[in-house]
Amino acid sequence: MYRIEKIGENCFYIKTLGTFPPSVAERFIQDFNEITKGLPEFCTIIDNLDAILLDVHSFNIILDLMIKSNERLIKSAFVISQNPPLDKEFQLLLEKAASPKRKIVRNLEEAKKWVGLEDIIIQRED
């Protein structure tokens, strides 16, 4: 599961939950491309605090989106906390996507600082 929220003129907060099977990854790509279609550039905070693992088949789907969006990306923060397998998956994704504009962070405050949105308040749902 995922949710995409606009948190600035060209910035988005993406919340992921559980696993990310290929059908969900493909729907996410469609939704994200539709939302960012008219934007020359954008930034994202991807909140993976409640994610478990990225499905193996979804890895390439997400990687393709990341590579295609490299030019338009301002900055992107991937929030991962205390999940070594997920951390490793995203390290591999970031290496393969080859962009210094992406970073793994440990909490939402670090993410906001990295993308330059310190004034935004993001409340976690429990």
Can you annotate each of these PLM segments?
Residues M1-D126:
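Amphipathic, Lys/Arg-enriched alpha-helical "gate/interface" segment within cytosolic domains
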